[in-house]
Amino acid sequence: MYRNTMRSASRPVIASLRSSTIRAAPRRFASTAPADKPRSFKGSLVRLGLAFGAVYYYNTSPIFADEAISKTVPAPAAFSDDDLPTVDSIVEEKRKQIKAKSEETAASSKTPESQQSNPQTAAADGSPAALEEEAGQQGAFNPETGEINWDCPCLGGMADGPCGEEFKTAFSCFVFSQEEPKGMDCIDKFQGMQECFKKYPDIYGAELADDEDGAPTPDFGDEQPSGEPTTAEVKSNGELARETKDKTAADATKFDDSQKPAESKTPAKTTSTSTDSAQKPAVDAHRDAEPKSDAETASSGSRMVQDVAIPIEKPVNDKYWQDMHKSEVQKKEVTVGITQAHDATAANEEIKHIERQEAAKKNAEKKQ
């Protein structure tokens, strides 16, 4: 009973509401745009957030990613610094190549005669530079450890002879020398080795013959090694400077005792100023005018010097008083000290050493 009454009472109310809503919402077609309504701030934020989210998803999602390239470039081979060639490895490889080439050439061109004469040739060509080059090629010297194999046949057995210790000292000094040119600080040791060779000419005859056939002794002219005092001119009055002569003789004796070499030394050559000047025709007349007694006192140690030279030729320019007047100027005595003579032995050794280096370079170029 109560339900029926409620339904009957609610029906007119529901009908009125439906009619009011239909009247309030006007009808429109699907193609027509809805009426513009003001949008709220929250709705704008939601729309912006959705737009940013869509863009982010498009950029990061693998669904929209481009397809991978089918053909890819292979990655470069990975290697460490240990695999790279070093300077030592390159030098060692070159030495092995040189050693292999030398062994091939030696095996192809070797004959029984060359095998017999090989030790003699090595002994004759036993210059420090050549021995060092050959020792480096045949493995006698190891630059990494600094060891020298004295039993190497490239040394010609010189390390085992009676002068073996002298040879080892000189050769090792030359190998480790840092001077330029190389070996300049080892001249004394090589001189000692040569002196030892001279004591055994039957064993080291080839070495001595090679040294004798080397470069000739250089001509130093008036500056040849001499143990005697320098010859000087005489006084015009013919008197000797006795005090100067005694002092010069004493100095010459000291100089001979201190500068005399061990065995081999070039003989002293005394050259007087009067003898050298005799070759000049312009001075011959002046020399002939002097008495013989003045010429005999040429080794007094004093030198006569003029303040102004006397012109010999005819006047060239009349404006200069030297060409107009020939005036004899009084000579005065000047004491000349003893000049130290050159050491010809050391000079010869240096020249021979340089020639040996050049010969070693030529041999190395030929072998290459």
From Swiss-Prot:
Bias (Low complexity): 264-280
Biased composition (Polar residues): 105-121
GO BP term, example: protein import into mitochondrial intermembrane space
Disulfide bond sites: C152-C154, C163-C196, C173-C186
Lineage: Eukaryota, Fungi, Dikarya, Ascomycota, Pezizomycotina
GO CC, alphabetical: mitochondrial inner membrane; mitochondrial intermembrane space
InterPro entries: CHCHD4
Region (Disordered): 95-144, 208-310
Compartments, as annotated in UniProt: Mitochondrion inner membrane
Protein function: Required for the import and folding of small cysteine-containing proteins (small Tim) in the mitochondrial intermembrane space (IMS). Forms a redox cycle with ERV1 that involves a disulfide relay system. Precursor proteins to be imported into the IMS are translocated in their reduced form into the mitochondria. The oxidized form of MIA40 forms a transient intermolecular disulfide bridge with the reduced precursor protein, resulting in oxidation of the precursor protein that now contains an intramolecular disulfide bond and is able to undergo folding in the IMS.
Cofactor: Cu(2+); Zn(2+)
Domain free text: The CHCH domain contains a conserved twin Cys-X(9)-Cys motif which is required for import and stability of MIA40 in mitochondria.
Record's bilayer topology term: Single-pass type II membrane protein
Assembly notes: Monomer.
Biased composition (Basic and acidic residues): 95-104, 240-263, 283-295
Short sequence motif Cx9C motif 2: positions: 186-196
Sequence intervals crossing the membrane: 48-65
Protein name (database record): Mitochondrial intermembrane space import and assembly protein 40
Keywords: Disulfide bond, Membrane, Mitochondrion, Mitochondrion inner membrane, Oxidoreductase, Protein transport, Redox-active center, Signal-anchor, Transit peptide, Translocation, Transmembrane, Transmembrane helix, Transport
Organism: Gibberella zeae (strain ATCC MYA-4620 / CBS 123657 / FGSC 9075 / NRRL 31084 / PH-1) (Wheat head blight fungus)
